[in-house]
Amino acid sequence: MPEYRSKTSTHGRNMAGARALWRATGMRDGDFHKPIIAIANSFTQFVPGHVHLKDLGQLVAREIERVGGVAKEFDTIAVDDGIAMGHDGMLYSLPSREIIADSVEYMVNAHCADALVCISNCDKITPGMLMAALRLNIPTVFVSGGPMEAGKTKLAEHKLDLIDAMVIAADDSASDEKVAEFERSACPTCGSCSGMFTANSMNCLTEALGLSLPGNGTVVATHADREQLFLRAGRVAVELCHRWYGGEDPTALPRGIATFEAFENAMTLDIAMGGSTNTILHLLAAAQEGEVAFGMQDIDRLSKRVPQLCKVAPNTPKYHIEDVHRAGGIMAILGELARGGLLHTNAATVHARTLADAIAQWDVTQTDDENVHTFYKAGPAGIPTQIAFSQATRWDSLDTDRSDGCIRDVAHAFSQEGGLAVLYGNIARDGCVVKTAGVDESIHVFEGTARVFESQDAAVKGILADEVVAGDVVVIRYEGPKGGPGMQEMLYPTSYLKSKGLGKQCALLTDGRFSGGTSGLSIGHASPEAAAGGAIGLVREGDRILIDIPNRSINLLISDEELALRRAEQDAKGWKPVEVRPRKVTTALKAYALLATSADKGAVRDKALLDG
């Protein structure tokens, strides 16, 4: 039977010094025979998705200790992509994922913790902690801070989010007063931004992976029901310890839960709900950490068979995450996918023996349990606040309309092809990704003229200066993991294309990535990236590019001979931007770039370089 890892420092005469230090943290004689459970919190006052987490780690800690464990909390960093957006701060966003993963590994392994509770929420924090959990492979449960309530204003017919504030700010026809009103109304509460952006997408995917509890991705941060998720997460962590250390149950460990089948389930959910393209990057990275052979080809295969069953902002202004919860949350989407024969329902979870058992218990269309129905009626209060669990508003009814509601059944899908697709061609040999859920069907096949920019900054200037016109393909390169470095999000270029009325008349292609708030014909993660010799680095001003989503292709319309000639010329010059870019690349960023792989590998470290 496995022994507690913590015995390394809590047992034996020669560990008297270590025990003395443990005692200084508050441990007593009886605690040295209990599991030590690490709580990885991510509280910070910089990020609205994390500003309310300060006391929640101790909430979990008290529950762990009430049911027989010893809790030890620490914090990791959290970067706000929205605040870091549009300047050199965004260079640090994706690299922070690796720092978060490393910091969790460092703390847990240095102190020989027996289990882990991950309190995450925003864009890189959930993926970073997920990578760490799969590296460590000790009993782990995730609980997120929860989504922000959607904003409201009398100046808009629909609810608001961060993207609305960004788009209106670049609209020359909007008054300063209207911009100010949107700014004040778009982000009213604590929590992760209210649409199906990267943070909420990832928190929803942890439900499908089996590593978090039902409602983790959809109960708003302000609602009292989320407190019960935190308390239950503490209890589950102790239960997982008993199952592993007391019974050697492999499904108590992350790698026993997040198997290949579970990754397929998570990606199937992602495609069905039109999640952020960043989720592809993060799932690929997590799979590598868990030694799961899940790759771009698997995502491509799934994207061709999974329909889109849920459509949420930024893909429509009608629904936000709070509306997904009212419709039954992630368990309801998983239920529809299961009935369509699209899931591996025998996959394990931290809270139920199988996913099938979880769906039977939590799918609002399948259970008569009033407690479950009440849980999914948890709604927004519409009161600006930064305090968790501060309201208990409930919808009068659930949205169970599966033919015309927020969540659809397979027969009434928003589209029979899902919300994400992988494209291949001579411009992206190893693939690139597009969120089809946000692309108007009229431009699913698009041929346009290349407008080439060597940085996001240059592209923004060009778009705002009206240098981009209808029919153009904006190409932004040398913004990949190595080339940026850091693979910046291109939210400002896509938002400004909308502001200029070009959202349905142009395409954007980059080796960088996109915010979960992006919509339109925005194609990212072009692999290999330009800095790694990718063909996106060979595109020239005025070239024609053909994008064909139905046939999953993207091609630069030049001959193979011309492409080879350009490659030889570029090899001689070196793969770097033509123009010197005014950005400060620090030693920390250079270290990240040195080991970073392209997006098709999840932009993780190249282990071949480390292994020598």
Curated annotation (Swiss-Prot):
Residues annotated as the enzyme's active site: 515 (proton acceptor)
UniProt subunit comment: Homodimer.
PANTHER family in the cross-refs: D-XYLONATE DEHYDRATASE, D-XYLONATE DEHYDRATASE YAGF-RELATED
Amino acids binding [2Fe-2S] cluster: 122, 193
InterPro entries assigned to the protein according to its UniProt record, in alphabetical order: Dihydro-acid_dehy_C, DihydroxyA_deHydtase, DiOHA_6PGluconate_deHydtase_CS, ILV_EDD_C, ILV_EDD_N, IlvD/EDD_N
GO CC term (a single one): cytosol
Cofactors required: [2Fe-2S] cluster; Mg(2+)
Binding residues annotated for Mg(2+), in chain numbering: 81, 123-124, 489
Organism encoding this protein: Xanthomonas axonopodis pv. citri (strain 306)
Pathway where it operates: Amino-acid biosynthesis; L-isoleucine biosynthesis; L-isoleucine from 2-oxobutanoate: step 3/4; Amino-acid biosynthesis; L-valine biosynthesis; L-valine from pyruvate: step 3/4
This enzyme's EC code(s): 4.2.1.9
Top-level taxon of origin: Bacteria
Cofactor binding comment, as recorded: Binds 1 [2Fe-2S] cluster per subunit. This cluster acts as a Lewis acid cofactor.
Its job: Functions in the biosynthesis of branched-chain amino acids. Catalyzes the dehydration of (2R,3R)-2,3-dihydroxy-3-methylpentanoate (2,3-dihydroxy-3-methylvalerate) into 2-oxo-3-methylpentanoate (2-oxo-3-methylvalerate) and of (2R)-2,3-dihydroxy-3-methylbutanoate (2,3-dihydroxyisovalerate) into 2-oxo-3-methylbutanoate (2-oxoisovalerate), the penultimate precursor to L-isoleucine and L-valine, respectively.
Protein name: Dihydroxy-acid dehydratase
